[in-house]
Regions:
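N-terminal assembly/attachment segments of tailed bacteriophage virion structural proteins
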Residues: 1-108
């Protein structure tokens, strides 16, 4: 499990582990947010090679699974939040952090 603290517009890595490619629904990412983020509907974005994958945390969610579509290499991860009740388009964002995925030893078609 990887753990992160989101404070204002910065993501701090609290616990890091080695991530291997070819996983499916195996790597959990857990988030803690400061009070500024409480009202927001939260989404985690993973970007690799011009592809972006969104994982919805919602307003109460604190964890998500690493997208299986990601492969070995660097991945940029950021969080954004929005207030669905704010008609003026309030949005919170973070500076991305880099996660490194290592090539796994998996061979097969499972």
């Amino acid at each position: 499990m990887l753990k992160f603290l989101v404070r204002q517009q910065k993501i701090e890595i609290l616990e890091r582990e080695i991530i291997a490619s070819d996983q499916i629904a195996f790597v959990t990412l857990k988030f803690t947010f400061d009070g500024d983020w409480k009202k927001f509907h939260k989404v985690v974005q993973f970007t690799q090679c011009d592809e972006t994958y969104n994982r919805v945390l919602g307003t109460d969610g604190l964890s998500c699974l690493l997208p299986a579509e990601l492969h070995a290499g660097a991945v940029k991860m950021s969080v954004f939040g929005y207030d669905a009740e704010n008609t003026e388009g309030l949005r919170a964002t973070t500076v991305p952090v880099t996660l490194n995925i290592r090539q796994s030893g998996f061979v097969g078609e499972f």
